[in-house]
Amino acid sequence: MIVLGIDPGSLSTGYGVVSTDDGRYRLLECGVLRLNPGKSHPARIGEIFEALDCLISRVQPGRLSIETAFVGRNVQSALKLGQVRGAVIALGVHRGLMLHEYAPREVKLAVTGRGGASKEQVAGMVTAMLGLGSVPKPLDVTDAIALALCDMLRNEGNVSLPKAKGSSRRGNGWAEFVKASPDLVVEPLKH
């Protein structure tokens, strides 16, 4: 199964494509669509739609995972984000993809074991789960990859994690995995 995770934004939209062909997670592609703030909002939505349509044609995912909308202090930003989400959802439906939406807290819980994890902790776990040599940048990308991984964990459940560096066997859960991989643990920022 191939899942496309999307972290939507009107100026920066992250994407991550993850597969589980052989029972292991594999990152197929990831990146960020950086949009020109000088263009109109509808023009940026059109660029997102076209770029993701090309990506879907190329990687042929079966599912699309997208972050749910949240309302912060800036209502105008929330409305613009909602329009981007709507375009991405419409594209997924048009292309016949199974669509799942996840709240940020649910994604963090699925990937790190903590619903209140920082973006840096999510990035660290994404890197560990996929056995990557370095953390993909920027955080919009790791958030999108985390959305794809969350979808796989919620809908497939029995996918193996790569072995932690220096371990001879798979651990008995997240606590042991983190203990065996101290170099992958990212501490939350102190305020």
From Swiss-Prot:
Mg(2+) 2 binds at E67. GO terms for cellular component: cytoplasm; Holliday junction resolvase complex. SUPFAM superfamilies: Ribonuclease H-like. Mg(2+) 1 binds at D7, D140. GO terms for biological process: DNA recombination; DNA repair. Its EC number is 3.1.21.10. One of its GO terms (molecular function) is magnesium ion binding. The active site is at D7, E67, D140. InterPro entries: RNaseH-like_sf (IPR012337), RNaseH_sf (IPR036397), X-over_junc_endoDNase_Mg_BS (IPR020563), X-over_junc_endoDNase_RuvC (IPR002176). Keywords: Cytoplasm, DNA damage, DNA recombination, DNA repair, DNA-binding, Endonuclease, Hydrolase, Magnesium, Metal-binding, Nuclease. Gene3D superfamilies: Ribonuclease H-like superfamily/Ribonuclease H. Binds 2 Mg(2+) ion per subunit. It is found in: Cytoplasm. Pfam families: RuvC. Its cofactor is Mg(2+). It catalyses: Endonucleolytic cleavage at a junction such as a reciprocal single-stranded crossover between two homologous DNA duplexes (Holliday junction). The keyword Magnesium applies. Belongs to the RuvC family. The RuvA-RuvB-RuvC complex processes Holliday junction (HJ) DNA during genetic recombination and DNA repair. Endonuclease that resolves HJ intermediates. Cleaves cruciform DNA by making single-stranded nicks across the HJ at symmetrical positions within the homologous arms, yielding a 5'-phosphate and a 3'-hydroxyl group; requires a central core of homology in the junction. The consensus cleavage sequence is 5'-(A/T)TT(C/G)-3'. Cleavage occurs on the 3'-side of the TT dinucleotide at the point of strand exchange. Homodimer which binds Holliday junction (HJ) DNA. The HJ becomes 2-fold symmetrical on binding to RuvC with unstacked arms; it has a different conformation from HJ DNA in complex with RuvA. In the full resolvosome a probable DNA-RuvA(4)-RuvB(12)-RuvC(2) complex forms which resolves the HJ. HAMAP family: RuvC (MF_00034). This is Crossover junction endodeoxyribonuclease RuvC. It comes from Chlorobium luteolum (strain DSM 273 / BCRC 81028 / 2530) (Pelodictyon luteolum).
